[in-house]
Design a protein with these regions (language model features):
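PP2C/PPM-type serine/threonine phosphatase catalytic domain
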Residues: 1-295
Length: 295
């Protein structure tokens, strides 16, 4: 078993709004990992006195603890309970009904000698490496499947000069349109973990036999830029890079690509530099039936 993780803020002057962690129970039976990507708050506030880093630390910590200690619960149930616990921790001081109350994307995975469970909510990514080499991405694609009128707004933003008043106004209009799709109770749009535990039922979940998974890699979208935005390689190449050079090297290469295109001319994006987090778990050979893993 090998765990490697890196988390780095997009701007060193501001705290990282991601959360990344992993746990290996002392029993030696499997493990779990969690990566959250906190949604950057709007300038006009969120109704919360704590902030996004506090929220992701509370939610991520609760989810990891539940996934590790409550193995009888599904990951969806663990996420639902973690959201409830986090909401209870600040419902007396904050307006959790605010549309932009702190929220985050979620990746979680849990494994033992028999199976690997996964959960993905919104645009963070989980990669499953199989023993014979192929890599399967687990994606929640709903944020990328925007309606045509919103895609048109996005194209309009990208066509306007960087830094101009026209671009700022167009971007504000685009952001409002996207936000109107977030956590819609009617089942349309896309979902992030905020204060409503019911959102957990919208997560992409599944189970894979342990014998079919040799490694896992969880990525916030700041780290998955290497493949999704900068097109430096496919998912298999990304995981191979991490296996060979580590998660720190992946983030460093993303930073190089960001610096090479500081104004988003070649690769239009909302942030020149984004928080980037990655957790890699190399599971190692599966223990023979009837034998406990040594972790």
């Amino acid at each position: 078993m090998r765990i490697d993780m890196t988390g780095e803020p997009g701007d060193p002057r501001h705290p990282n709004e991601d959360y990344a962690s992993a746990a290996l129970p002392s029993s030696g039976e499997g493990g779990a990992l969690v990566v959250l990507d906190g949604v950057t708050p709007p300038r006009d506030g969120t109704g919360c006195v704590h902030g996004v880093p506090w929220f992701t630390a509370r939610l991520g910590g609760a989810l990891l603890e539940l996934a590790t200690a409550q193995r009888d619960l599904t990951l969806g149930s663990c996420l639902s309970e973690a959201i409830s616990r986090t909401a209870a921790a600040h419902c007396s001081t904050c307006d959790l009904s605010h549309s932009r109350t702190p929220q985050a994307t979620v990746v979680a995975a849990r494994w033992d000698e028999e199976r690997v469970e996964h959960l993905v909510l919104s645009d963070s990514v989980l990669l499953l490496e199989h023993p014979d080499g192929p890599v399967t991405p687990v994606l929640d694609s709903r944020l990328g499947e925007l309606p045509p009128h919103i895609r048109a707004l996005r194209s309009r933003v990208r066509a306007l000069p960087e830094g101009g008043a026209g671009r700022r106004a167009a971007r504000a209009e685009y952001v409002r349109a996207v936000e109107a799709l977030r956590n819609n109770p009617d089942g349309t749009g896309f979902y992030t973990a905020a204060a409503d535990p019911a959102v957990a039922r919208h997560a992409v979940t599944g189970t894979t036999p342990r014998s079919e998974v040799s490694a896992l890699l969880a990525l916030s979208d700041g780290a998955s830029r290497w493949s999704e935005m900068f097109r430096l390689g496919d998912w298999a190449a990304l995981l191979a890079l991490v296996r060979k050079e580590g998660t720190g090297s992946l983030v460093a290469r993303v930073r190089e690509a960001e610096r090479a295109d500081p104004h988003g001319t070649a690769h239009p994006r909302g942030k020149a530099h984004d928080d980037a987090s990655a957790v890699f778990a190399e599971l190692g050979p599966q223990a023979p039936a009837g034998e406990a893993s040594d972790g």
